[in-house]
Amino acid sequence: MNITIISVGKLKEKYLKHAIDEYSKRLSRYCKLNIVELQDEQTPDNASEKDELIIKDKEGNKILNSIKDNMYVITLDLKGKMISSEELSKFIDNCGVRGNSNLCFIIGGSLGLSEAVLKRSNYSLCFSKMTFPHQLFRVMLLEQIYRAFRISNGEPYHK
């Protein structure tokens, strides 16, 4: 299984980098992990709705250019489906069974994802109705993917 995480914005905090490194190391026995960081566009404090749409489209184009044709794209979006850790485990297993062994999770920037990215998505997932910093969310996503593999393999971790 190949898993790519495309994320808008660079990690700045060392403690988050350490957490990502730890989960990347743990995941290496289950999948080939590739993390793609894309430069976010600066959003002025007084940005209009039109300005925000332009920024989302620019970030969206960067995301779309990073997606390969053979990838099964999973967007992380507030309008996505909320599922449990067990359901995520089954979902990842089922993707592999159906021949979708190149999963691509997409984390948008502070303004969210463009319509073009949402249209390219094969599945939309929502972790919570709450808003999280995208840097922290990257750690949360990696932890849930790791948990999903542990559940799938019947290994102790999930409680």
From Swiss-Prot:
Q: One MF term in GO for this entry?
A: rRNA (pseudouridine-N3-)-methyltransferase activity
List keywords of the entry alphabetically.
Answer: Cytoplasm, Methyltransferase, rRNA processing, S-adenosyl-L-methionine, Transferase
Is S-adenosyl-L-methionine included in the keywords of this UniProt record?
Answer: yes
Where this protein primarily resides, as one coarse class? cytoplasm
Its GO CC terms are:
cytoplasm
Pfam families cross-referenced by the UniProt entry:
SPOUT_MTase (PF02590)
Kindly give the InterPro entries that the UniProt entry links to this protein: Alpha/beta_knot_MTases (IPR029028), RlmH-like (IPR003742), tRNA_m1G_MTases_N (IPR029026)
As for subcellular location, the record says:
Cytoplasm
EC number(s) in its UniProt entry?
2.1.1.177
Q: Which reaction does it catalyse?
A: pseudouridine(1915) in 23S rRNA + S-adenosyl-L-methionine = N(3)-methylpseudouridine(1915) in 23S rRNA + S-adenosyl-L-homocysteine + H(+)
Q: Which residues bind S-adenosyl-L-methionine?
A: L76, G108, F127, S128, K129, M130, T131, F132
Q: What does this protein do?
A: Specifically methylates the pseudouridine at position 1915 (m3Psi1915) in 23S rRNA.
**NCBIfam families recorded for this chain?**
PRK00103.1-3, tRNA_RlmH_YbeA
Q: How does it assemble?
A: Homodimer.
Which protein family is named in the record?
Belongs to the RNA methyltransferase RlmH family.
Q: What is this protein called?
A: Ribosomal RNA large subunit methyltransferase H
